[in-house]
């Protein structure tokens, strides 16, 4: 079995096992057959996201109307649920378009599969939020217009009634303070479970939401020194301590083993006192609660607050026959006004300070500026390894098992063993 086909098979299987994320596929040996010398195609997962799709189409239209455009860019949008299948099919046939979007943590997998090429942009990316720049093996393969940030939300009036202080960037809650806050809030008798951490979530939510807590305890998904083994970091003492704490939130009645389908709406309906969510919920919560809403950093569980970094990003395929034009478009799209337009349409954190300055909510002193600070201060990139889709799947299974009452050590040992076997079977995912 040749090396490229082995990589294709490994990345496609990993993708299929991780619901809700993008998987990898084969190197595109040519750009889409519909492309000509003066036209390049760009694929996006945003067919079901009209606001973001329109913002992207507006950027493309502005570029196409520019006298400096090196080619016309044609947008083709897919529903997110079918986007991965479309990419896999096109890559297998050698018909990938020139530009694709991809969920940030999966970029190394795509690069390893040899169908993304390193970016060569005229734009300086050093001022971008680090989580919006995807790298692997020392090279940059994708860049995003925005990120999102995890946080905790509560009503100031509830915290005051319970005698609990508001956590801040300067002084986040410690594990002991979090325990005390939950105990006092539960004692008010207003909620069956004062904490909602979205435990009904599936797919990428599981590693995105819960691995930062593991990291704050001192564990991790994989040893980042070479990314060759999860043994000792995913199933070591600190990781087992995290798992026991996580299940303990259920055992103590602080949170449900399986939350409702819409945790944000449940919080707004006063079914919980503290909501663990992301910046995407801020505008809706602010509109409903006004000045009673407080946004707080995640808990310092021993090694500082941690949140997951990276959202959807853009890359250029290896088979693109007009890579110069593709790179030129991406460089153009990274202008502050374009970043601001997309971030404003999606309610996300703009990738640069210059773009943030164009959005009142994210400018200095703006209501949502705190999320940008969370991202800069707390974001941890999900492991930048081609093994990530498999790692994410195995961690997700372990997290769900722990929530269901499984032995923490056993659940984490099982995940670590599977991850190590996968890495070994793929030759360490070396370039």
Model segments located where?
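Conserved N-terminal structural module of periplasmic/extracytoplasmic solute-binding proteins
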Residues: 2-107, 302, 324-325, 341, ...
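Extracytoplasmic/periplasmic substrate-binding proteins
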Residues: 45, 64, 209-212, 240-322, ...
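Periplasmic-binding protein-like
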Residues: 55, 156, 330-353
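Extracytoplasmic "Venus flytrap"/periplasmic binding protein-like
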Residues: 62, 66-128, 135, 142, ...
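Helix-loop-helix "hinge/cap" segment bordering the ligand-binding cleft or interdomain interface
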Residues: 65, 134-208, 219-258, 318, ...
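A structural signal for short loop-to-beta-strand junctions that line the ligand-binding cleft
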Residues: 90, 98, 124-159, 193, ...
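Long, aromatic- and glycine/proline-rich binding clefts that accommodate carbohydrate-like moieties
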Residues: 296, 344-394, 426-431
């Amino acid at each position: 079995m040749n090396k490229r086909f082995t990589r294709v098979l490994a990345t496609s299987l990993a993708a299929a096992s991780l619901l809700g994320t993008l998987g990898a596929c084969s190197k595109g040996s040519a750009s889409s057959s519909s492309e000509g010398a003066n036209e390049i195609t760009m694929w996006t997962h945003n067919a079901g996201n009209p606001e973001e799709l329109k913002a992207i189409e507006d950027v493309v239209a502005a570029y196409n109307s520019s006298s400096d455009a090196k080619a016309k860019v044609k947008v083709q949008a897919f529903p997110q649920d079918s986007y991965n299948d479309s990419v896999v099919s096109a890559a297998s046939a050698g018909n990938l378009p020139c530009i694709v979007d991809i969920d940030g943590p999966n970029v190394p997998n795509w690069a390893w599969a040899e169908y993304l090429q390193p970016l060569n942009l005229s734009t300086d990316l050093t001022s971008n939020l680090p989580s919006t720049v995807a790298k692997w093996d020392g090279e940059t393969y994708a860049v995003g217009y925005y990120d999102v940030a995890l946080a905790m939300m509560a009503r100031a009036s509830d915290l005051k009634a319970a005698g609990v202080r508001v956590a801040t960037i300067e002084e986040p809650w410690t594990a002991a303070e979090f325990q005390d806050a939950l105990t006092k809030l539960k004692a008010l008798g207003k909620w069956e479970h004062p904490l909602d951490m979205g435990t009904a979530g599936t797919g990428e939510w599981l590693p995105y939401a819960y691995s930062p807590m593991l990291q704050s305890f001192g564990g991790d998904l994989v040893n980042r020194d070479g990314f060759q083994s999860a043994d000792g970091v995913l199933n070591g003492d600190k990781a087992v301590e995290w798992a026991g704490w996580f299940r303990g939130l259920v055992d103590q009645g602080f949170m449900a083993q399986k939350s409702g389908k819409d945790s944000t709406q449940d919080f707004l309906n006063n079914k919980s006192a503290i909501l663990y969510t992301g910046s995407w919920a801020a505008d809706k919560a602010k509109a409903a609660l006004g000045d009673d809403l407080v946004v707080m950093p995640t808990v310092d569980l021993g090694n500082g607050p941690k949140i997951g970094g990276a959202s959807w990003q853009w890359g250029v395929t290896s088979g693109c026959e007009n890579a110069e034009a593709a790179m030129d478009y991406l460089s153009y799209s990274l202008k502050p006004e374009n970043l601001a337009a997309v971030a404003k349409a999606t309610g996300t954190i703009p990738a640069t300070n210059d773009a943030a300055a164009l959005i009142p909510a994210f400018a200095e002193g703006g209501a949502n500026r705190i999320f940008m600070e969370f991202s800069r201060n707390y974001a941890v990139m999900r492991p930048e390894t081609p093994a990530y889709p498999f790692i994410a799947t195995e961690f997700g299974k372990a997290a769900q098992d722990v929530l269901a009452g499984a032995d923490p050590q056993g659940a984490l040992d099982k995940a670590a063993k599977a991850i190590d076997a996968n890495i070994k079977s793929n030759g360490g995912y070396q370039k």
